[in-house]
């Protein structure tokens, strides 16, 4: 994000905070000092915005926007938490677990060594999936 008129003293600094696509819309809404609509065309409900504004990251590099980040696309599943990432591809029923701090290229599956962490991430992903129109798809 570059906003010289408002954040000039941070110009050129790089942030490594984790964010995802819905955070872009939330950031635009925050920057415009407006709110996300709840309805459109005479009262049709809009699904609430999922993201969080990234503007706080500009002034505080310790800001965590989300405890977990989730995703799913054509049965490819992902969940991030702290330095951990769990993934399952569309051809597999098995989740893999990676420590991104030690293994940025996701080469070493740690699911057997860390079953509690994997279970926590998969449980959180399933909660998210059940509330975000991922299921039912044969679960």
List the predicted regions and their residue ranges:
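Active-site-proximal N-terminal segment of extracellular/periplasmic enzymes that hydrolyze or transfer
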Residues: 108-116
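Short glycine- and hydrophobic/aromatic-rich loop-to-beta-strand nucleating segment
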Residues: 1-2
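Short, well-ordered alpha-helical scaffold segment located
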Residues: 6-7, 106
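Intrinsically disordered, low-complexity polar regions and short flexible loop motifs
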Residues: 103
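Basic, alpha-helical interaction scaffolds
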Residues: 123
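C-terminal cap/loop subdomain of S1 sulfatases and analogous C-terminal strand-loop tails that border
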Residues: 7-13, 17, 21-100, 117, ...
């Amino acid at each position: 994000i570059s906003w010289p008129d408002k954040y000039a003293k941070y110009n050129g600094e790089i942030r490594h905070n984790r964010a995802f696509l819905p955070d872009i819309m939330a950031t635009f809404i925050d920057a415009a000092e407006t709110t996300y609509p709840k309805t459109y065309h005479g009262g049709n409900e809009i699904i609430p915005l999922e993201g969080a504004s990234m503007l706080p990251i500009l002034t505080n590099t310790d800001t965590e926007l989300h405890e977990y980040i989730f995703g799913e696309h054509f049965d490819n599943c992902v969940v991030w938490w702290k330095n951990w990432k769990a993934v399952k591809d569309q051809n597999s029923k098995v989740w893999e677990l990676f420590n991104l701090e030690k293994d940025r290229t996701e080469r070493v599956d740690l699911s057997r060594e860390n079953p509690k962490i994997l279970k926590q991430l998969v449980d959180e992903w399933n909660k998210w999936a059940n509330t975000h129109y991922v299921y039912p798809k044969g679960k």
